[in-house]
From Swiss-Prot:
Taxonomic placement: Bacteria, Bacillati, Bacillota, Bacilli, Lactobacillales
Positions contributing to L-tyrosine binding: 34, 169, 173
Name assigned to this protein: Tyrosine--tRNA ligase
UniProt keyword Repeat, yes or no: no
Enzyme Commission numbers on file: 6.1.1.1
UniProt catalytic activity: tRNA(Tyr) + L-tyrosine + ATP = L-tyrosyl-tRNA(Tyr) + AMP + diphosphate + H(+)
Gene that encodes it: tyrS
Source organism per UniProt: Streptococcus pneumoniae (strain 70585)
Length: 418
């Protein structure tokens, strides 16, 4: 199957500048293309993964990727469809984020092997040395204010206000495309659908300044239930950094995908063939309660992002927590599986009677409720049901001398630390 057709069948093409011309270019030989990643945090997130994996698919098809990390544009901030202006970061902060993101990209693109091995670039290398006068004379003169204000991303900010700094962002992104075309013969840019205005600024600059044709592919944005884009500035991000979103949390994210989205996400986020995905779809629709599509999705993406061992650990944590087998997990695994649950620091001189601890830790509101819960068998300490009102937590209940896991009912977990 032609790579362009595969991208379409996977639902990875939202818009293109000229489908026929792009298809022809991809058929005739190796195409050099780039995707830009602005360092707005110390990690990329799930929203970036769509473009990253699309870039990887093109590389596997023989084309050459350039990964641009925006050391310069990250200092400015992209206004595209943001409700408010981004906070400006120091250069030292952005430089640190650039290094982190470059390391993450190395997990997905091959920077070592073959004539189409990926190349990492940083746009600070060309923006850092350009003067303001040269910027206006050599780049700015090719953009009319009318053209710039016609972009949807700008229109949405005109009423609330947009700084010149952010207004000029599209020129900077356009110049990125121009530089990569001149220096590396890059003719295709890939990005999120919210980037269409910035990306076509690049094709316009190529046309006017160099009389060349550039191509653009936008990939669909992944949205939450409210229709908002997954990304740091909108909250609820699923990060690719395991310190920010653990492999277990990422596993749970995919396991909780709605049935209506599961097969679509298999096409977008995995490298399973379309035939394999079709077989999974048939099995899934025949027995949706078994959640096969979600299980495969969680396995494939967690393995892709964090490795097979991290996937196995996430699966084990899931199974043991579901069964209530707390003691079968290490403290490291428990911290991963119970990240975000209520936590209470037990004081050295605090009485460790179960009833009193349930109240002092905030697990229940009163001693009466605590006694009822214990007597009714609703309280578990490290997976063991406790029904003795006089039970006192001892050192034996401190897992690896660090924590105790309290469960109230079937699913409400609490962690006591020492």
């Amino acid at each position: 199957m032609h790579i362009f057709d595969e991208l379409k069948d996977r639902g990875l093409i939202f818009q293109t500048t000229d489908e026929e011309a792009l298809r022809k270019a991809l058929e005739e030989g190796q195409v050099s293309y780039y995707t830009g990643y602005d360092p707005t945090a110390d990690s990329l997130h799930l929203g970036h993964l769509v473009a990253i994996l699309t870039s990887r698919r093109l590389q596997l098809a023989g084309h050459k990727p350039y990964a641009l990390v925006g050391g310069a544009t990250g200092l400015i901030g992209d206004p595209s469809f943001k409700d408010a202006e981004r906070s400006l970061q120091t250069k030292d902060t952005v430089d640190g984020w650039v290094k982190s993101i470059q390391g993450q990209l190395s997990r997905f693109l091959d920077f070592e092997n073959g004539e189409n091995k990926a190349v990492m670039v940083n746009n600070y290398d060309w923006f850092g040395s350009i003067s303001f006068i040269d910027f206006l004379r050599d780049i700015g003169k090719y953009f009319t204010v009318n053209y710039m204000m016609s972009k949807e991303s700008v229109k949405k900010r005109i009423e609330t206000g947009i700084s010149y700094t952010e207004f000029a962002y599209q020129i900077m992104q356009g110049y990125d495309f121009f530089v990569l075309n001149q220096d590396h013969n890059v003719t295709l840019q890939i990005g999120g659908s919210d980037q269409w205005g910035n990306m076509t600024a690049g094709t316009e600059l190529l046309r006017r300044k160099a009389d060349k044709t550039g191509h653009v592919i936008t990939v669909p944005l992944i949205t939450d239930a409210t229709g908002k884009k997954f990304g740091k500035s909108e909250g609820n991000a699923v990060w690719l950094n395991p310190e920010k979103t653990s492999p277990y949390e990422m596993y749970q994210f995919w396991m909780n995908v709605m049935d209506a989205d599961a097969v679509r996400f298999l096409k977008i986020f995995t490298f399973l063939s379309l035939d394999e995905i079709e077989d999974i779809r048939k099995q899934f629709e025949a027995a949706p309660h078994e959640r096969l599509a979600q299980k495969v999705l969680a396995r494939e993406v967690v393995t892709l992002v964090h490795g097979e061992e991290a996937y196995k650990e996430a699966l084990n944590i899931t199974e043991q927590l579901f069964a209530g087998n707390i003691k079968n997990l290490s403290v490291k695994e428990l911290k991963q599986g119970l990240r975000g649950v209520p936590n209470y620091q037990v004081q050295a001189d605090e009485h460790n009677n179960i009833v009193e601890l349930l109240v002092s830790s905030g697990i229940v509101n009163s001693k009466r409720q605590a006694r009822e819960d214990v007597q009714n068998g609703a309280i578990y300490v490290n997976g063991d049901r406790i029904q003795d009102l006089d039970y006192v937590l001892s050192d034996a209940d401190k897992l690896e001398n660090e924590l105790t896991v309290i469960r109230r009912g079937k699913k409400k977990y609490f962690v006591l630390t020492y």
